[in-house]
Amino acid sequence: MFKVDLNSDLGESFGAYKMGMDEEILKFVSSVNVACGFHAGDPCVMDKTLNLAKQNGVCIGAHPSYPDLLGFGRRNMQISFEEAKNYALYQLGALFGFAKAKGMKIQHFKAHGALYNMAAIDENLALALCEAVASFDENIIFLGLSNSAMNEAAKKKGLRYANEVFADRAYNDDGTLVSRKLEGALIHDENLAIKRVIKMIKESKVTSINGKEIDLKADSICVHGDNIKALEFVKKIKENLEKEQIQICALENFI
């Protein structure tokens, strides 16, 4: 039987600002990526998010970002190896404090936004993130884009690596994600997106935006629950995976 993890970004509210439908999405996913304060989230939100994850039996991961609250972590930054490593360590430590207080463990590490996209093509940046994870806890799974520089970096640092794919995003011919700024970056046809997901899991292939068949491994599928429509889409994905006898379970069960 095929196994796959469903992950979603959570805890992205902060202060008086509420974002996402965290309570609802937790009913359908097996792992969550918790914002650690640099692009979103704050101590109270982190506390609440971990409580919700624990109540629902969902595994947690750190979701660190560039220090860019204003830009929601989606703006590229040029930072040094040491800065990248230390920013990652700082955010891991923040989440660990809450996790330890609740008797929980950090299952995985997944970079956010621009940090994720840049680390996918910049092995030096990816190595900095992997070094942070390895020095913090070598048992933490590094979750990153399938067939990317992050995968190679994780191997070099001796970390377990989980290959992530996206249900609603288009791919370039080289396996990177099409920029959100470009037309066609998001797939709005739900049935097409679900067919693509099943193909990625069962055949380890996806069709790029230019029609090229590319190889990739799907250990975890990133889904979103920002609004009612997105939530309904996640429910449909889960239902279709179960029909295909694909088992949904957290990464720690098979990576």
From Swiss-Prot:
Protein name as catalogued: 5-oxoprolinase subunit A
InterPro entries noted in UniProt: Glyco_hydro/deAcase_b/a-brl (IPR011330), LamB/YcsF/PxpA-like (IPR005501)
One matching Pfam family: LamB_YcsF
Sequence similarity: Belongs to the LamB/PxpA family.
GO molecular function, one term: ATP binding
Gene3D superfamilies: Glycoside hydrolase/deacetylase
Summary of the function given for this chain in its UniProt record: Catalyzes the cleavage of 5-oxoproline to form L-glutamate coupled to the hydrolysis of ATP to ADP and inorganic phosphate.
Subunit structure: Forms a complex composed of PxpA, PxpB and PxpC.
Catalytic activity annotation: 5-oxo-L-proline + ATP + 2 H2O = L-glutamate + ADP + phosphate + H(+)
One of the protein's GO biological processes: carbohydrate metabolic process
Alphabetically ordered keywords of this record: ATP-binding, Hydrolase, Nucleotide-binding
Its EC number(s): 3.5.2.9
Annotated organism of origin: Campylobacter jejuni subsp. jejuni serotype O:6 (strain 81116 / NCTC 11828)
